[in-house]
C-alpha cells in the first residue's frame, strides 16, 4: 500500500491547439487518494474520437490535451482503500474515470451515462486538475474505473478492447441481441467495425459487412470471417438485402444518409449508432414507422460490461487486428487514421517509446 500523497509529474504527448499535432509535454498528475491506482502505461490504442478531440471538432477542446483512452498498464502503487488490485497487476481503463455515484445510471452499473461523468482527458477532475489521457508514461485512476486484464491477452491486443470491443459488446447485450442465429450488419470496417464482426461471429450471428467500396471484401470475408459483403452503391445488391438484418452497427464517423441502411432492417430491426458525428443525420419517418424499426445509439459500456467483454474475448480467442507503433510515429498514425489507412487499430507501445 502507498499513501499516494506526493505530487508526481509525467511526460505525455499533447496537442496544443486545433492543428492536432502532438508533441512532448511534461505535467503534474492530478491529486490522488485512498481509492486511486498509480499506473505505468504499457499500451494505448488510437481511436478516431481522439482526432475529434485534438482538432476541436466538437467545439469543446481545452489545451494542452494528452489524448488516448484505450489504456493498458501496470499498477505501480495502490491507495489505502483499494481492495481489488495489487502492485504488479495488469489493468485497463477507458474514457470515463469519474461519476456522481448517486444517479440512476450510476446505481444500475451504467455509469458511462451519468450526466456528471468525468472524461479521462479534456475534462477536469474533482480536485480541479485537468484530466489527461493514456499517451503518457503514467496515469492516476480510481479503482472503480479500472478492470483487470485477463492472463493470455497481450497488452497491445487488449488496449483497443477498452473502447472498440466494449462499444459493440454492450449494445448486443443491452438490446437483447446476444443469442445465436441473428443476422447482423456492420457498416464501416474500421477499429470498431472489425471488432463488431469478430464479436458478433463469436456469438453465432450471420454477419454482413457494408462498405462504400469493394476494396475490403477479401479482408472482411477471408480474414475477419464475415458471411456476406455489401457495397452501398450497388443498387441491386442493396435491394436484394432488403428486410434481411436484425440489427446494423453504424460505425461511420462522418455524415451519411440513413435511409439505405434502414431499408436493410427486418421488422423491429435496430440501427445502432456508434460513430461520433457533429452534424444532423436525416431520414424520412415512414422508413422507421412502417417497419417498427429503431434508430438508437450506444456509448462504450459499463465497467461491469467491460470485464464481461474481456472474459468473453479471452474465452473465444478474440483479439484486435492492430499495427503497433512508437510514440514518435503518432502524428503520422493520426493522419493515416483520418484517411482510413490502418488495419484496423493503431496501438502505441508507450512503455517502449521515448516520450521526452
From Swiss-Prot:
What's one GO BP annotation on this UniProt entry? lignin biosynthetic process
Per the record, the pathway is:
Aromatic compound metabolism; phenylpropanoid biosynthesis
Q: What Pfam families is this protein classified in?
A: ADH_N, ADH_zinc_N
> What are the binding positions for NADP(+) in this chain?
49, 167, 188-193, 211-216, 251, 275, 298-300
Note on cofactor: Binds 2 Zn(2+) ions per subunit.
* Keywords annotated in UniProt: Lignin biosynthesis, Metal-binding, NADP, Oxidoreductase, Zinc
SUPFAM superfamilies linked to this entry:
GroES-like (SSF50129), NAD(P)-binding Rossmann-fold domains (SSF51735)
Gene3D superfamilies, from UniProt? Medium-chain alcohol dehydrogenases, catalytic domain, NAD(P)-binding Rossmann-like Domain
Q: Which reaction does it catalyse?
A: (E)-cinnamyl alcohol + NADP(+) = (E)-cinnamaldehyde + NADPH + H(+); (E)-coniferol + NADP(+) = (E)-coniferaldehyde + NADPH + H(+); (E)-sinapyl alcohol + NADP(+) = (E)-sinapaldehyde + NADPH + H(+); (E)-4-coumaroyl alcohol + NADP(+) = (E)-4-coumaraldehyde + NADPH + H(+)
Q: Which cofactor does it need?
A: Zn(2+)
Binding, Zn(2+) 1: 47, 69-70, 163
Q: Where does Zn(2+) 2 bind?
A: 100, 103, 106, 114
Picking any one GO molecular function of the record gives: coniferyl-alcohol dehydrogenase activity
Query: Which EC number(s) does the record attach to this protein?
Result: 1.1.1.195
Please give the InterPro entries that the UniProt record associates with this protein. ADH-like_C (IPR013149), ADH-like_N (IPR013154), ADH_Zn_CS (IPR002328), CAD-like (IPR047109), GroES-like_sf (IPR011032), NAD(P)-bd_dom_sf (IPR036291), PKS_ER (IPR020843)
Quaternary state and interactors:
Homodimer.
Cited function:
Involved in lignin biosynthesis. Catalyzes the final step specific for the production of lignin monomers. Catalyzes the NADPH-dependent reduction of coniferaldehyde, 5-hydroxyconiferaldehyde, sinapaldehyde, 4-coumaraldehyde and caffeyl aldehyde to their respective alcohols.
Family assignment from sequence similarity: Belongs to the zinc-containing alcohol dehydrogenase family.
Protein name listed in UniProt: Probable cinnamyl alcohol dehydrogenase 2
Source species of the chain: Eucalyptus gunnii (Cider gum)
